[in-house]
Amino acid sequence: MSPDAQLPDADYVVLGSRIALGLDGGFAVAVPARLRLLEEAGAREPLMLSVDGQSPEVHAAQRQAFVDGGHVPEVSRMRNLFDELLSGGQRLSRAGSPGGQTPGVAYRTVRDAGGRAVVELPVFENDPEWHLRDANVVVHTAEGDRVLRGFRGLYIAWLDAIADERRAAAGDPDRLFVVVCESRQIGEALVDWDDPRVRLVHTIHNSHLPAPHDDPTAPVTGLWERWLRTLDAYDAVVWPTEAQRDEVAERFGDPGTFHVAPNTIELGDEPRAAASRDPHRVVMLNRLAPQKRVDLAVRAWPAVVAAVPDAQLDVYGDGPLRDELQALVDELGVSASVTLHGATAERDAVFDRSAVFLTSTAFEGQGLSIAEALARGLPVVSTDVRYGPREAVGDAGVLVPPGEIGALSAALIGLLQDDGRRAELSAHARAAAAAFAPDAVRPALVAALRAAVEHPSRRAR
């Protein structure tokens, strides 16, 4: 491996709030893929960390799913804050200071399997900034109660303990600890972490724009507004697309830390030839959630099936809108040609029997499923939304204006009725997907992390 392709010597972790296959869509695929990239670039046993409060039993099942699916090499690479608190909490026994609950604040007690109180968490109902409040978190240890400065203090104390573990194992008390933060709420909570041995790198997974997500000058509010105010605090910020990086830099400024490294996919075996597929089968693969606007595809379908009577639309994925979408299918009278299949573990097999991949999404950070479909040789019909479809599709598909049902219908009809055009687009698909292969993306990610490591911490005082 060339020096430029290898990470600087340090310990590396990726950190999210919750990372769960089947619950967190493409995010739960992209994060462990980044973990693998780190290891391939020379990181020593990088970890995937989470801070959600599900039970240890739920976390154990989620970890096993990552291992069984080939996403993470072994369960020991995944750790959770609350699992470790419930197993004793002694790693935080030296954190914080003696004390108790903050007066006037409601608390929730977390207990272990034996009923012993382990930690007391402040509760802030309907407060979007709960993670930034300073009310004490109380950790019960064998040496007595310790208080930490809110959830920020809790997260930092846990990460400090892991960093110290790794330093002790390496025999180097000054070893750098690099946290690749995958969740904005967590990133916000870490900007006061001023240890000069820590580097904080933040990745982006979605559009920062408010609905309807197509105006780069629209007022940015809520979580995104708060997060953008913290841009200067990160040692590197990794955007999934050039378009989003450029629009954010133009509007909010680039502190000299912006990089682009898309989420990766595995290319897999060579796809089936276009002629061997069901020529009139269209497939969608996404969460059944408002962002994905599957309703637009369903509304476009009556015109498609009128023009191509044997056309079939297979929709794979689950989510809160499943019943609503099924009702729409029934209302439009297309239940014979539109099927909501639910989640599938046979993604490639589904792609290999289809002729066209369709997404009618309202916005994206990158659109990982587009790259996955391209890797299987599928032409893509996508709404031309910010961000990702335009950069991914290239000359391997058709982009249509967001929200235009007639344009969706016309694009699908045009491809389903033109075998030659489908074959032409399919021939370009694999090359388009190659831009998202690990070997293509790794140099950009390494460059971002190298820049962070080779400069002093932006938070050190």
Across the structure, where does each feature detected by a protein language model lie?
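Conserved acidic donor-binding segment of nucleotide-sugar-dependent glycosyltransferases
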Residues: 394, 398-406, 414-420, 434
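Membrane-proximal helix-turn-helix segments that form the acceptor-binding/catalytic region
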Residues: 163-167, 207, 216-237
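Aromatic "clamp/platform" in nucleotide-sugar-dependent glycosyltransferases that forms part
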Residues: 343, 362
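Short hydrophobic beta-strand element within catalytic cores of glycosyltransferases
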Residues: 379-383
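A short, well-ordered alpha-helix in the C-terminal region of glycosyltransferases
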Residues: 350, 414, 421-435, 444-447
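C-terminal alpha-helical cap of glycosyltransferases
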Residues: 438-461
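A conserved mid-protein helix/loop that constitutes part of the nucleotide-sugar donor-binding site
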Residues: 280, 284-303, 308, 313-315, ...
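Carbohydrate-associated surface elements
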Residues: 243, 264
